[in-house]
Amino acid sequence: MLIREILEESVQKFGEVKAVKWLNRKEVLERSYSEMLRNVISIRKGLLAEDFAGKHIALIGTSSVEWIESYLGIITGCITAVPLDAALPCEELIDLINRSDSEALFLSPKHRPYLEAFLANCPKLQKVWMLQEEVEDLPSGVYSINELRAMGKSAAEDASCPDAEAIATIIFTSGTTGKSKGVMLTQNNLASNVEAVKISAEPGTAMLSVLPIHHAFCLVMDWLKGFSQGATICINDSLLHMVRNMS
């Protein structure tokens, strides 16, 4: 079974269950499994229409519903996702974008100050999508996530299901003992890790995601495993607020 199949099965079982909850200032926002899958499919179809099949796409940002929907839109098609540490300095992010052969980028609004440097120093970058629904005054080649979703909604063709041995994601090591290295994980690597951990949770069980989302453990055990159980993943916006958010 692939992540795409795990996600589709979860939506069939838990469609109206809340998949993600997060804080927007003081307001708690939610997105159901059905709503999330619709966005994932729109992103996936949009990327196919933009001719990114078989290519590498980087993501830079902290945990957000836009981040995880974009990641799933990438890996459930025939594209390789490259999640990068949002806390790295601009120069290191440029190096990782280039070394990973990423040809597109999903970027959080917090990292917009880096945008000009990325466009100037990452020659393979063709397009950048901001992980924000409404964005103004964007330079050429930069778009909002809403524009990609809209393209996907109007596209007739969907991406085929990826091969089990295709590279789903490249996750870079921390680089504490030298230059960070990109670890290639296949579709089967991700799915088998999700299926190998035997835990049971009632649909709608609230799970607080604390670790940075680009970490392999956080991605697989918090998000992908949680989705397989029909859990509600609650985004912790800051370690300083963790106790408050748990309540």
Residue locations for each model-derived region?
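Conserved structural elements of the adenylate-forming
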Residues: 37-42, 155, 183-203, 207-210
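AMP-dependent adenylate-forming
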Residues: 7-31, 136
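Conserved AMP-binding/adenylate-forming
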Residues: 29, 44-88
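Conserved pre-ATP/AMP-binding loop-to-beta segment of ANL
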Residues: 15-18, 130, 150-172, 179, ...
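Flexible, low-complexity linker/hinge segments
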Residues: 1, 116, 136-167
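Structural core segment of the AMP-binding/adenylate-forming
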Residues: 76-147
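Conserved AMP-binding/adenylation subdomain of ANL enzymes
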Residues: 191-206, 213-247
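Conserved AMP-binding A3 loop
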Residues: 30-34, 168-194
